[in-house]
Structure formats: C-alpha cells, structure tokens
Swiss-Prot record:
<dbReference type="InterPro" id="IPR014780">
    <property type="entry name" value="tRNA_psdUridine_synth_TruB"/>
</dbReference>
<comment type="function">
    <text>Responsible for synthesis of pseudouridine from uracil-55 in the psi GC loop of transfer RNAs.</text>
</comment>
<dbReference type="GO" id="GO:1990481">
    <property type="term" value="P:mRNA pseudouridine synthesis"/>
</dbReference>
<protein>
    <recommendedName>
        <fullName>tRNA pseudouridine synthase B</fullName>
        <ecNumber>5.4.99.25</ecNumber>
    </recommendedName>
</protein>
<dbReference type="GO" id="GO:0003723">
    <property type="term" value="F:RNA binding"/>
</dbReference>
<dbReference type="Pfam" id="PF16198">
    <property type="entry name" value="TruB_C_2"/>
</dbReference>
<feature type="active site" description="Nucleophile">
    <location>
        <position position="41"/>
    </location>
</feature>
<dbReference type="InterPro" id="IPR020103">
    <property type="entry name" value="PsdUridine_synth_cat_dom_sf"/>
</dbReference>
<dbReference type="GO" id="GO:0160148">
    <property type="term" value="F:tRNA pseudouridine(55) synthase activity"/>
</dbReference>
<dbReference type="InterPro" id="IPR002501">
    <property type="entry name" value="PsdUridine_synth_N"/>
</dbReference>
<dbReference type="Pfam" id="PF01509">
    <property type="entry name" value="TruB_N"/>
</dbReference>
<dbReference type="InterPro" id="IPR032819">
    <property type="entry name" value="TruB_C"/>
</dbReference>
<dbReference type="GO" id="GO:0031119">
    <property type="term" value="P:tRNA pseudouridine synthesis"/>
</dbReference>
<keyword id="KW-0819">tRNA processing</keyword>
<comment type="similarity">
    <text>Belongs to the pseudouridine synthase TruB family. Type 1 subfamily.</text>
</comment>
<keyword id="KW-0413">Isomerase</keyword>
C-alpha cells in the first residue's frame, strides 16, 4: 500500500473545528484523501478518528455508537442548547437528590425520539439547520429515533445546578438535546455546559493523540483492523488474493451480518466484502498494493 493507510485518533482541542483538524493532517501527511468520522462542535473536546488515504473508504463500516462525558447546567435555556448560544431564559433549579435525578433520567434510556437542536447539521429543505438559525429563522425540527444505550449519573452539584453524565449512544444523538429535554422535564430548563467525547467509531480516548503542529512529524497511523473488530472476518489464501483483487466472488461460511472484513494471507487488510444470499462474498472495497 503506497502512502499512509489507516487511522489517526486526535484528541480534538476546544476551539478547533473537525474540518480544521482534517486540514492540519492533510498538510502533515501530504495527503488529499483525509476524512473524519463524526463532527465535533468547536467547543467539544475528545476523540476524533481521522482516516488517511484509502482508509477513508472504510468510514461507513465503522461502528456508529459514541460515548460522551458531559456537564449539564440546569436553569439556563439558550438558543443553541449549550452555553455557546444566546441566553433566552433563566430559572431556579429544584432542590434535587441523586435518587430524584435517576428517576428523571430513566425515560431517556433506550430507544427514544429526540428533537435535534436548531443549531445543528440536520438538513431542512436542502440546507443545514444551523445556517437557517444564524439568519434568525425559528424552526421546529421533527424528532428522530435514537438510542441511548447507557446513561450514568457521575456527579450532582446542587449548589451550581450542574450534573455530570456519561452517555453511550447511537449515531445521530445530540447531547445538547438531552440537556434541553432533561431540563424541560425538571421544569427549570437546561443546556449543555461542557462535553468531551471519550469513544467514537471503535476508537478509545486512550488511543487519542494531541493535534500535531502543521510542520511536525505526524504519528504513524493505526491499523484499520482495530476499528473493525465488530465485523466477521474472512482470510484469503495465497491463491485467492488475485481473485479478490479482480473482483471475483469468493466462498463464505454461513454467518451473521452483511459486511465482512477480508484479510490477506499475511493478515493485512484486503478490503470489505458483502455477504450474498447464496453465501458468496462479493468484493465491495478492494485494497491492492497501490491503494
């Protein structure tokens, strides 16, 4: 494989956009094909997986769930559902015990319908909602199905009206919406005060590195196989490798799932195949010696 191939996990600092991190790595690696796996708002820090070279073709096959650690401020309602937006209203928060907060959090666990924030990347009539919101347009975005797999109360500060949560959720979940809706349920309003992503697309906080300077030597990329452990694998024999690169179907043992990771005889990444009804493997993403 010519050139860098794999993933770099950046610990995105506050103040940077996801796009600015991608631009920095393009310069560091001298690559055009660089893409990130899930936008983080500028104020949010944490895990930002970035694909290098041909690995950008693997982004749709990575697990979509994410984990966040966030602080919710009760008693404040803003235009963006976080402290970055215009303060619209303030109210005193109730005197709550942790047990009462657990009761309030219970309806948000599992599959729920969630309304995205007005300042979001959701498309409205072909345009991003945040562009309309910045022009002063008021929108009521329709709720969408999301799943909150785990919602854990880590800390409650009754003096500041702040609670710290850990949230493991499906793709498309907005923690700002969770803050808004929880505050609404408690009758005082709420918004997101602070957020850090600790896991995304199969990559962990422990794998994240600081964003390198533009002229710095970039870190070696991680193997794409690290983020594809949720998929079944099919290892090629030496004689099958040429068939795979020519796009020919291969035999496949019965098993779950549609996407299958395909590895060369030496264990390196060969691509992604799709399981067919006749238990044949159809090449979908094929990597060869030239990428």
């Amino acid at each position: 494989m010519d050139g860098p191939f794999g993933f770099v996990v950046i610990d995105k600092p506050a103040g940077h956009t996801s796009h600015s991190c991608v631009s920095r790595l393009r310069r560091c690696y001298g690559l055009k094909r660089v893409g990130h796996g899930g936008t983080l708002d500028p104020a949010v820090t944490g895990v930002l997986p970035i694909a290098l070279g041909p690995a950008t073709r693997l982004l749709p096959y990575l697990p979509g769930d994410k984990t966040y650690r966030g602080v919710i401020q009760l008693g404040s309602i803003t235009s963006s559902d976080d402290l970055e937006g215009e303060l619209l209203r303030q109210a005193p928060w109730p005197d709550l015990q942790p047990e009462e907060l657990e009761v309030a959090l219970a309806p948000f666990r599992g599959p729920i319908q969630q309304r995205p924030p007005q300042v979001s990347a959701v498309h409205v009539d072909g345009e991003r909602a945040h562009a309309r919101a910045r022009r002063g347009e008021q929108m009521v975005l329709p709720p969408r199905p999301v799943t909150i797999h785990r919602l854990q109360l880590l800390h409650w500060d009754p003096n500041q009206g702040q609670l710290t949560l850990e949230v493991h959720c499906s793709a498309g979940t907005y923690i700002r919406s969770l803050a808004r809706d929880l505050g609404e349920q408690l009758g005082c309003g709420g918004c997101l005060a602070q957020l850090r992503r600790t896991q995304a697309l199969g990559f962990l906080e422990s794998q994240a590195q600081a964003l390198p300077e533009a002229d710095a030597t970039p870190p070696p990329p991680l193997s794409p196989l690290l983020a594809l452990e949720h998929l079944p694998r099919r290892q090629l024999t030496d004689s099958e490798e040429a068939d795979w690169r020519c796009g020919r179907r291969l035999s496949l043992d019965p098993g779950p799932g549609d996407a299958v990771v395909v590895c060369n005889a030496d264990g390196s990444m060969a691509g992604i195949g799709l399981r067919q009804e006749d238990d044949q493997l159809q090449p979908k993403v094929v990597f060869d010696a030239s990428g």
